[in-house]
A protein has these predicted regions:
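Surface-exposed amphipathic alpha-helical segments
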Residues: 43, 159-189, 297-322
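Short Gly/Thr-rich strand-loop-strand
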Residues: 49, 54-82, 100, 110-149, ...
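A short acidic-to-branched-hydrophobic micro-motif
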Residues: 81-121, 153-155, 220-246
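Bacterial N-terminal signal peptides that target proteins for export
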Residues: 4-23
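Boundary at the C-terminal end of the N-terminal hydrophobic targeting segment
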Residues: 36-38
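Bacterial N-terminal signal peptides
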Residues: 23-33
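Short S/T/G/P-rich N-terminal loop/turn motif that feeds into the first structured element of a domain
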Residues: 223-230, 287-297
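Structural recognition of the beta-strand scaffold that forms the well-ordered cores
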Residues: 145, 152-155, 284, 291-294
Length: 322
């Protein structure tokens, strides 16, 4: 005998939505676990591996997120957040002798090498010699900065009397030795050809190349070409569509500034030459999800050669990384 029974069907959309919610929760838990492991690893640096003769860590390490960083450095938080800041882990260090001296060691996790490099380049003293710590470093008797991999590190001293710079260098070396990652520079710096480049002029900019919001994040580098300083830049966009849109917005800006632009079809249909307000001639080209250019040009042909070399270097570097 057939026994009828009722079965309540759920719409497919409802089931799909529930699955999506479950996946989101699982992904959140996974990211949280990974993040927690990363946090504990940096904290261990102050508990298990910090070893500087005559100095000890006071209490527990402190930690700040993008939401709370302003509590520690007030208005300076916006600068770091603009460069992809993930988390700050730090600790206070004092002499084992009980003197009133103090040192603050702050480790900024910037998410990736490019962000850490960008922060360091904008904070560094161009006149100060490198100390050979991490990827690059500089410092004085009471202040030392270095970057390594995705980390940017500041060490600030509050000494009651003048002390040898070696104190901070020992601390920085100890921290650098135990930070994860390597001392290599961001791979994107290889996009700039070496010929006529001004050594050390590379910068990673967050907040607008040439002050343009539509050129938000990218690299710039200075060159000496025929006795004139020229700046090349590479803007990184999320997609080809975004890159094309940025070029169009640039053209709109130039038109509003009463600057004419002429197409450069040899570099593609979205490439042009113009004059940027407050600068000399500028060449802009779009290549994939990048916008590449050079400004302060007094020799257009030399500018074209430089951009052609940059395009070649990008293709070569990208091919090696595959």
């Amino acid at each position: 005998m057939h026994m009828p029974f009722s079965f309540k069907y759920k719409p497919i959309d409802t089931i799909r939505n529930q699955c999506i919610r479950i996946l989101v929760v699982l992904l959140f838990l996974l990211v949280t676990c990974i993040h927690c492991m990363a946090e504990s690893g940096i904290e261990d640096l102050f508990t298990d591996t910090f070893s500087v003769p005559g100095w000890k860590v006071d209490g527990e390490a402190y930690r700040y997120s993008p939401q709370s960083l302003y509590e520690y450095i007030n208005g300076g938080a916006y600068f770091f957040i603009g460069y992809g800041f993930v988390e700050l882990t730090g600790a206070n260090v004092s002499p084992v002798t009980g003197e009133n001296d103090a040192v603050a060691v702050d480790i900024y996790d910037m998410g990736d090498k490019l962000n850490a490099f960008g922060v360091y380049q904008l904070r560094k003293d161009s006149q100060a010699p490198s100390l050979g710590i991490g990827t690059a470093s500089f410092g004085s008797n009471d202040y030392l900065v270095f970057h390594k991999d995705r980390f940017y590190v500041e060490i600030r001293a509050f000494f009651s009397d003048r002390k040898d710079q070696g104190v901070l260098e020992n601390m920085a070396s100890n921290v650098a030795e135990h930070l994860p990652g390597d001392n290599s520079l961001p791979k994107e710096l290889a996009y700039f050809p070496e010929k006529e480049k001004i050594i050390g002029s590379e910068r990673y900019i967050s907040g607008g190349i040439l002050g343009h919001a539509f050129f938000d994040k990218g690299l710039s580098c200075d060159y000496h070409i025929k006795g004139k300083k020229v700046t090349a830049f590479i803007v990184f966009l999320p997609s080809v569509r975004d890159a094309v849109r940025s070029v169009k917005r640039h053209k709109t800006f130039l038109k509003q500034s009463e600057k004419k632009y002429l197409p450069l079809e040899e570099f593609g249909k979205h490439s042009f030459i113009s004059e940027e307000p407050y600068y000399q001639k500028i060449i802009v080209i779009q290549e994939g999800a990048r916008v590449i250019g050079a400004y302060d040009l007094n020799d257009v042909e030399a500018g074209k050669t430089l951009l052609a070399d940059i395009l070649r270097k990008i293709k070569q570097t990208t091919a090696k990384q595959k």
